[in-house]
């Protein structure tokens, strides 16, 4: 181990002697036992910055930046045409004006909206108030019928308990003439 260390020092000294550069402090024997590697001839510069540059480990911002770039792209992709469309609708079509309703004419539910885009959305995507009312009334009727059936079932159960009846009232009693007693008469056959 000591021989390898000495061999390394000798080789460093030989290379330094051949290259003409001096080594650090010499401890004798022509520099064979030096304690350092060749020193730099010029002072060390750290790229003109305010000190030594460090490699700081921090989380990647790649996905954050990519998300924000794509978000801006898709907002521009959809927002600009939507803004142009709304501007054109407001300029060329405009809002509806209040007018007298002719006799015998029943307005549709979307005709009560002022803006044309609101009218289009109400006509194509929303149900009419009459349809919503009828649907709600149907649900209320079904729930009322269920409540009435629950009350009747509770009354039937009370009467069954009072009279000692059981669930057999669901089935008709079989006629006794249809029962075959022959297997019981001769069980060994």
From Swiss-Prot:
Any one GO molecular function term: NADH dehydrogenase (ubiquinone) activity
Residues annotated as transmembrane: 73-93
Topology of the protein relative to the lipid bilayer: Single-pass membrane protein
Gene Ontology BP terms: aerobic respiration; mitochondrial electron transport, NADH to ubiquinone; proton motive force-driven mitochondrial ATP synthesis
Coiled coil segments of this chain: none
Main localization of the protein described in the UniProt heading: mitochondrion
Keyword Transport: yes
InterPro entries recorded: NADH_UbQ_OxRdtase_B5_su (IPR019173)
One of the record's GO cellular component terms: mitochondrion
Cellular localization per UniProt: Mitochondrion inner membrane
Residue range of the transit peptide in the UniProt record, numbered on this chain: 1-46
The keyword Cell membrane is assigned to this record: no
Alphabetical keyword list: Electron transport, Membrane, Mitochondrion, Mitochondrion inner membrane, Respiratory chain, Transit peptide, Transmembrane, Transmembrane helix, Transport
Function: Accessory subunit of the mitochondrial membrane respiratory chain NADH dehydrogenase (Complex I), that is believed not to be involved in catalysis. Complex I functions in the transfer of electrons from NADH to the respiratory chain. The immediate electron acceptor for the enzyme is believed to be ubiquinone.
Protein family according to the UniProt entry: Belongs to the complex I NDUFB5 subunit family.
Subunit structure: Complex I is composed of 45 different subunits.
Name recorded for this polypeptide: NADH dehydrogenase [ubiquinone] 1 beta subcomplex subunit 5, mitochondrial
Source species: Homo sapiens (Human)
Lineage: Eukaryota, Metazoa, Chordata, Craniata, Vertebrata
């Amino acid at each position: 181990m000591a021989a390898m260390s000495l061999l390394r020092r000798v080789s460093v000294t030989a290379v330094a002697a051949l290259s003409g550069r001096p080594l650090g402090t010499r401890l004798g024997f022509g520099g064979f036992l030096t304690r350092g590697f060749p020193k730099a001839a010029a002072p060390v510069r750290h790229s003109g910055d305010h000190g030594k540059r460090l490699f700081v480990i921090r989380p990647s911002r790649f996905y954050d930046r990519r998300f924000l770039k794509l978000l801006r792209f898709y907002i521009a992709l959809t927002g600009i045409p939507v803004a142009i469309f709304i501007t054109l609708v407001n300029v060329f079509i405009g809002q509806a004006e209040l007018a007298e309703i002719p006799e015998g004419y029943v307005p549709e539910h979307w005709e009560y909206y002022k803006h044309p885009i609101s009218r289009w959305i109400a006509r194509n995507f929303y149900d009419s108030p009459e349809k919503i009312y009828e649907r709600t009334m149907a649900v209320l009727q079904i729930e009322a019928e269920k409540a009435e059936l629950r009350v009747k079932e509770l009354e039937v159960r009370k009467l069954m308990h009072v009279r000692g009846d059981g669930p057999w009232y669901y089935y008709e009693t079989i006629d006794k003439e249809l029962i075959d007693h022959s297997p019981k008469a001769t069980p060994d056959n």
